[in-house]
């Protein structure tokens, strides 16, 4: 399979050892899975905190939650566990360079410099599109801009 373009978002490429990945999965899944399955946190404290964050951060948190798509009762906990864990333990080499493939990364500056360093470590020549935004804010809050950027990349304008 050959791709002309690879487009990644803000927090892709998280990695951990099998032990750390299992620990993260087992700690976070009970908190996150109810949001995926039911569209809301099971914990009243977390749901209250989400409500507070929605009022503090304007439309970003609401748009992000809407982007997640609401309740998905058909998604099993085992499926989420497998995806979360495998994302963390799948090895990724450094300085990937596939001739004829351009790697484009939508980099949310508000996530921090460590992400830029990660992109530059794993890809030989990534094209980094800096956005002065939060995690996935471009897609969640400005889908037209996101789509235009993807279109411009595909048409060779970026």
Indicate where each model-derived feature is located.
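Catalytic histidine-centered segment of alpha/beta-hydrolase-like enzymes
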Residues: 131-147
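C-terminal alpha-helix
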Residues: 148-157
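Short, structured coil segments at secondary-structure junctions
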Residues: 2, 122-124
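Conserved serine/cysteine hydrolase catalytic core
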Residues: 75-121, 138
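Conserved alpha/beta-hydrolase catalytic His-Asp/Glu region
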Residues: 17, 37-96
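Short aromatic-enriched loop/helix-cap "lid" or pocket-rim segments at secondary-structure transitions
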Residues: 17-22, 116-118, 141-143
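Flexible "cap/lid" loop of the alpha/beta hydrolase fold
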Residues: 2-35
């Amino acid at each position: 399979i050959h791709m002309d373009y690879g487009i990644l978002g803000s927090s892709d490429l998280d990695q951990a050892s099998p032990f750390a990945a299992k620990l993260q999965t087992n700690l976070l899944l009970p908190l996150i899975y109810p949001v995926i399955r039911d569209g809301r946190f099971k914990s009243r404290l977390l749901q209250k905190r989400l409500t507070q964050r929605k009022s503090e951060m304007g439309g970003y948190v609401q748009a992000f939650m809407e982007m997640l798509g609401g309740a998905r009762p058909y998604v099993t906990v085992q499926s989420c566990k497998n995806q979360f864990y495998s994302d963390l333990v799948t090895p990724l080499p450094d300085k990937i360079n596939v001739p004829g493939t351009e790697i484009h990364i939508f980099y949310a500056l508000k996530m921090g410099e460590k992400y830029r360093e990660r992109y530059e470590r794993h890809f030989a020549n990534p094209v980094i599109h800096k956005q002065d935004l939060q995690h996935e804010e471009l897609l969640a809050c400005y889908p037209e801009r996101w789509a235009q950027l993807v279109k411009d990349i595909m048409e060779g304008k970026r």
